[in-house]
Regions:
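Cytosolic juxtamembrane helix and N-cap/initiation of the first transmembrane helix
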Residues: 1-24
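Mid-membrane cores of alpha-helical transmembrane segments in multi-pass membrane proteins
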Residues: 20, 55-60, 77-89, 105-113
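Membrane-water interface at the C-terminal end of transmembrane alpha helices
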Residues: 111-125
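Membrane-helix boundary connector in multi-pass membrane proteins
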Residues: 70-71, 78-106, 121-125
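A loop-to-helix transmembrane entry motif
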Residues: 14, 39-56
């Protein structure tokens, strides 16, 4: 445990990454309710699997908890980075092969959030 206080922007960045995961979960639920495009093929089924919503909510909860428990920040940020990277790669793969629409935007957004989470995981305060 570090006796040094974290950088002032660290809790804010953790909350932004948590909000991004919560938004991803909401988008997945709304899409499954019929407001978005239906997945086609194996890649689409993997990218739009309902378990992703729960995984994103778990990552968001871990990130929010780590704002109060700095010792948990590294593993929470790595969980966020791996989750968002895997989901984004599936989205981009889906968009490239099957459905080139707003899926590109969601996949790119996810990779940006994954980069933020990786920065948080490797940051020395």
């Amino acid at each position: 445990m570090s006796l040094q206080a974290p950088h002032p922007s660290t809790p804010r960045m953790l909350r932004v990454a948590a909000a991004a995961h919560a938004l991803a979960a909401v988008l997945l639920v709304v899409g499954r309710a019929g407001y978005g495009g239906r997945p086609r093929g194996l890649i689409g089924d993997m990218a739009d699997n309902p378990w992703w919503a729960l995984i994103h909510l778990a990552a968001a909860a871990a990130l929010l908890a780590s704002t109060h428990h700095p010792d948990a920040r590294t593993w929470a940020a790595w969980l966020s980075a791996f989750t968002m990277t895997a989901w984004s790669v599936l989205l981009l793969w889906w968009a490239a092969n099957l459905e080139p629409d707003g899926t590109w935007l969601a996949g790119t957004f996810g990779l940006i959030v994954a980069a933020i989470s990786t920065t948080l995981a490797t940051r020395e305060d």
